[in-house]
Amino acid sequence: KTRGAARFVQDNPANAIYIRCTPVGGTLTAMLRQLGTALKLPATRNRLELSMAIHDRLKGTDKVIIIDEAQNLRFDALEELRSLSDPDDLTGESGTGICLIGNSEVYSRMLGKQEAQFAQQFSRVRFRRRYSTADVKLADVEKLFPTLADGSHGKELAFMTGVCRSKWGIRGAMSVYTNAVRNENTSLDGLRGIAASMGVGVLS
C-alpha cells in the first residue's frame, strides 16, 4: 500500500499530497498542520484559519490527498477530510479527492461496525472502493519481486503470494524477501526460514 502510494506521488508530484498519520498525529490539529505544511501554507495556531486556508488553496485544483495509516485518524479529523471532498455548495465544483490507506480497522469503523458516527460519515462518501491484501494476485507479486518472475521460481512466488495475502501483507513480504537477500538465500527454504525467524505466517 505504502509503496503504491509513494509511486503514485512520484508519478504525480503536482497533483498528489501524501501524509503519513502516526498514532499521535491523528488529531484534527495534527492533520491540519501536516496538510498546511504539505501545501506550504504559513504556520498558524488557529485551526479555523488553517482549515480555511487549506480549503482555499485546494479549491479549483485537481489534487488528491493520500492519508497513510489512516486508522490512526480521530473522528473530527476524518470529518474535516470529508468536508474537503464535498463539492462547492455555490458552484457545484468537485471537491478534493481523498484516499485513505490503512488496515481493516479504518474500513470497519467507516462501515459502522464499531461506531455509528462513522457509518453516517461513510454513507456520505459517494465513491468508495476497498482493496485488501487478500486480493493480491500472482501477477502483482511478480511485479513486486521481478527476480523471482523468471519462470523457474514458481514455488518461491507462490510462497511470497501467501505472505502477501496474510495479515502481514505486502510490507511483511518485502521484509521477508529483503532479509532473505541479505542472507544470500532466496530459495523456497531460505524464504521459509526467514519468515519463520520473523514469526511471519502464510496463507495457502
Predicted feature residues:
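Sensor-1/coupling segment of RecA-like P-loop NTPase cores
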Residues: 73, 86-118
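C-terminal alpha-helical "lid" subdomain
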Residues: 6-10, 119-123, 127, 132-204
